[in-house]
Amino acid sequence: MWCLLLVAFIVVANGHDFKTIYSWNYVDFDFPNESIRDSLISSGHYIPENNMPLGLQSWNDKFFITIPRWKNGVVSNLNYISKNDQSQSPKLIPYPNWETNCIDFPGSIVSIFRTKVDACDRLWGVDTGVTDILGNATVVQPVRIFVFDLKTDKVLRVYTLKDSDQTSNSFFADAVVDVDPNNCDNAHIYISDLSGYGIVVYSWAKNDSWRITHNYFHFDPLHGDYNISGYNFQWTDGVFGLSLSTPRNDGYKTLYFHAMSGITEFSVSTEVLQDATLKRSSDYHTFHVEGKKGARSQGPTSLIDTKTGIDYFTQVSKNGIACWDTSVPLDEDSFVLVAQDNTTLVFPQDISIDPLFNMLYVLSDNLPQLMFSNYDPKTRNFFLTAADLDSLTPACKKQNSKSR
C-alpha cells in the first residue's frame, strides 16, 4: 500500500513544490490504552505541548522521528510512524519499544536529536543523555552512540564517548554515517559538536573514537542573529550540518560541513578524519573553504543526493530548502532556494532522502515557539513535507553553467 501511495504522490507533484504528507497540532503516541495515557498526563510524565518532533529519517515503510527532551513530559525520544498510515496526524510508536525509551530504566535512550540509516540497514543515533534541556538541564546518561539492526529491531552496539572526545561545553545534535556497503564493518560516524566546536569520529571496526579540532568548526559572529516567527534571538552554534559525497578516485569521500551560525561551507577528505594519529596542527590546510551561501542562509542540516551530487540545505531564516550542485563552485548564484513556505516550512529541522522513490522529505517544527512560548494545540504546528527529487534537480542545476 505505501508503495502505491508514494507512486501516486510522485504523479501528482508539480514543479518543485513540497506537498504535506502529515501534520500535527501536537504529538500523540500509540499508548497501550487510554487509561495509561490519562495517567501519564495526570502525573506530568506526558505533557503533549512539550513534545516537539525534530529528527527525521526515512527507511523502507517507516519514518523515524525523534522527540528530544527539551522540556519535561516527553514519554519517548526515538519513534517511528508507518508510511501505511493514512491519517493526517499519525500517532508515534516508540522504537524499538517503550522500555528502551523509558528514562527511568537503566541504559535507556534519553535524548537523541537526529538519526541516520546506513547502507547496511542500521539506524545510528547519538544520545546527548540530557533531559529538560531548556529548563533545569540534567545529565541522566553519558553521551552514547546507539546502533540498531533495522531488520531485527535489536540494539547492535552502544558506545560511550570518551572524556577526550568532549569539552565542558560539548553538545551533539547531528551526525553522518560513512560505510562501505560491501563491508559493513568498514563504517565511521562523524559527529558534529556544535557548542564545543569539534567533530568526533567513531570507527565501528576499531570500536574507538577520537576528536578533530579546527578553526573552521567555530561560529561566525556576524551571522548569529536570528529573527524567526516573531522572535529575535542569538545563537553561537558552530559546526552542525554534515553531508558526504560519493567515493572519489582514492576511495575516500568529501565531508562538507558548516556552522549553524554561519553562511560559509567547508570541506575535508574523510581520509583526514579517519586517521586518528595525524598531527592536527600540521593538517590545517587539508580543510578547504567551498564558498559562501549568501545572507540569511543559516540552517542546521544538509544532505547530498548521491545520484546527482546536489547538496540540500534547511534554511531556518527563510523558512525554506536550498540546494547547491557540488560539481560547481559555491557562491550566492549557485546556492538556490528551491522551496519556501511560511506555514509548512517554518524552521525546517531535518531532511531525508528515499532513494527507492527518489523523494526528499522535510520535517519542520517552529522550534522558537517551543523555546520562547508554547505551541497552540488548536493549530497545525509540525509538518512532514515531501518533493520529488526529479522536480528539484533542474532548479538546482539551472544556475550552474560553470564547471569545477
Give the location of each predicted region.
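Beta-propeller blade signature
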Residues: 76-86, 140-153, 202, 376-392
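Short loop/turn segments immediately following the C-termini of beta-strands
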Residues: 68-70, 128, 192-196, 204, ...
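Beta-strand-rich domains and repeat architectures in extracellular enzymes and scaffolds
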Residues: 21-76, 113-114
